[in-house]
Amino acid sequence: KGITIRNNERYIIETAYANGWVKESGIPLHRNGIKVAVVGSGPAGLACAWRLNQLGYDVTVYERDDHPGGLTMYGIPNMKLPKEIVARRVKIMEEVGVKFVLNTEVGVDVFGDELKREYQRIVLAIGARQARDLNVPGRELEGVRLAVDYLTDATKSVLKNGTKASKELEGKKVMVIGGGDTGNDCIATAIRQGAADVKQLEITRCPPSKRPADNPWPQWPRVAKTGYGQEEANELFEGVLTQYETTAVGF
């Protein structure tokens, strides 16, 4: 019976957690006395903090939000990446010596000069939160939102209310502009928030259903694919979900 790489990796990871190997691998053999501040607790910040702690540095991570994790906590919806998985890793990091300072934005709540006085090294892992915007009429209207803000607020609601999504879109029609993974996450999130209908605009042309001759293996296949959010929308709503070679010129 064939098995997927995902299943193999999941088994290895869960076995390591169950046997305490993850925590064991993070315990430093010695401390070198050097204090490091890591600004940002997204994937890069967490990876950096973990490795520096392994090497014996005294690491403190500064995060402006109320939970560590950055993109993994706020940018990826809970149904795609359950937040307890992120929290599990953060808990182990704390147990092996990494410290987290939350609700603290560098440059607002604490300043660079202060960090320089307290730490011998500073790592900037602040991520890329500036989204691509649309400079079209009506962009400023209420209800027109950037995906990064929408998904962040949706996750904060889930963290506040458990795994139950708010129903702020109940009975409303939603248009998602963009056909990538983030757009797919927005579709799935809107469904869970009670949207009456969801449609999508994609600026590129629809890929072919089969791999073209000029796109042989091992190149990444340029073929049409349907994400989990799109599959859900196709099941729930009538009509064509995605309109290709189309973008918004105004709201």
Identify the meaning behind each predicted range.
Residues 8-30, 55, 91-108, 131-193:
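Glycine-rich dinucleotide-binding loop and its adjacent helix/turn
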Residues 76, 139-140, 214-219:
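Short secondary-structure boundary/capping segments
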Residues 35-60, 182-193:
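N-terminal Rossmann-like FAD-binding beta1-loop-alpha1 element of flavoenzymes
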Residues 84-132, 155-164, 191-251:
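A Rossmann-like FAD-binding core segment of flavoenzymes
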Residues 57-73, 198-208:
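Glycine-rich FAD pyrophosphate-binding loop
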